[in-house]
Amino acid sequence: MKILFASAEVDPFAKVGGLADVASALPRRLFEMGHDVRVITPCHASSLTAFHDGEAPVELMVNSPDGARRVGVATRTGTGGVPVQLVLDDEFFGRPAVYGEGDDLHRYQFFCRAVIETLRRDDWIPDILHINDWHTAPLAFALRNLAWGDRALRGIASVFAIHNLRYRGPDELNDMVCQAVYYSNMVTTVSPTYAREILTPEHGEGLDSLLQMRASAGALVGILNGLDYDLYNPRTDSHISRQFDLSSLEGRAANREALRAEFKLPPSSGPLAAMVTRLTEQKGIDLVLQTLPEILSSGGQLLVLGDGDEALTAELTRLQAEHPDSVRLAARFDDGLARQIYAGCDVFLMPSRFEPCGLGQLMAMRYGAVPIGRRTGGIADTVLDAADHGEHATGFLFDDFNSSAFAAAFERAVVAFHRQDVWQGLQLNGMSRDYSWGASASRYVEVYLAALRSRGIVPLE
């Protein structure tokens, strides 16, 4: 099957969030399964070296409100050998910011036009156009609208992936997201639980009725995001102080001490709790702040890596000054440091208001940390609560979004932390779970085949 994956960011060319990981790892796994996969993405400033280092780009003209513009499309090799097409327009994309620019509406509408022109002029025509979030949402309507009069586009089926319905880009693109849900042959979300949650007014962001219609037709599917187990492997990870695996779990103690040394934290009698996150309302930082007295009274410490909301940053900075032996904030994102945190913390906190999938809990379990999270979205699908799963458990969950519920879950974790056999069982269970891309990629293939069948196309399986 020929699959074109359109994304605003793709690791290692540009990365802001989890979308870049998915746009790298999922195509790679599909490629390894024998499918003919390509990725197309804007050439942001971080990709300029790769763009200019290789064969000359193909030039094409793309319409814009200001008239036709000349762009370059350079094909480079991405993760695992997957071809990645970098679309360069200096004015729109030759700048550091991937998102958050005042002209994001025009930038990504223009990128979508460039994707269509690339499809029209390329000898390689995909069976599937995999569209991701608001940045590429206009492609669904464009494909449906133009296909009748364009043979190159006629046989392409579309799949629209919702990574986070809360983030829908500029207001003018809200209708495009709605149209993408309506016009795409299939719609996916990044976890089974989130697929159910967005059918409700609470999580549907005004699209719950439309999503219910697609779900009743069998056209909405929740597929859990995977984790690249080659990239995130504590046995080989050069970013952590000491490599370890299931048979050498004592290596985590060395990583915990290295983590404390990095942040100048003294030893403590309780668990070292950590978050690697954007500092936003969604992530439940307010619950952590409200529960900090309970965390500290248990002998615990809190370490946060991430940036975002200024008020949350200021409050964490104040708490760090107030509790110099117990609280640390690194107000930035650092992938290497994040891995050291996964490898060295005892508990990983994810008290999210909602969490479409979440990769943090998957990385934490992969590195032997025990997650404490709210039972929502992908957290509910991946963390096995100690009260429900006994000897097979991997962490601790709570339901209600309030500090009392979170504090109760943390207290359960503290009790387990002081029972070495129980705690080690939780760690080993988490490390033994398989949340790699294999099973998820196979589910995507099923969705692609369903999308083709919905177009009346008999796929060559």
What residues fall within each predicted segment?
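Catalytic cores of nucleotide-sugar-dependent glycosyltransferases that transfer UDP/GDP/TDP-activated
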Residues: 1-461
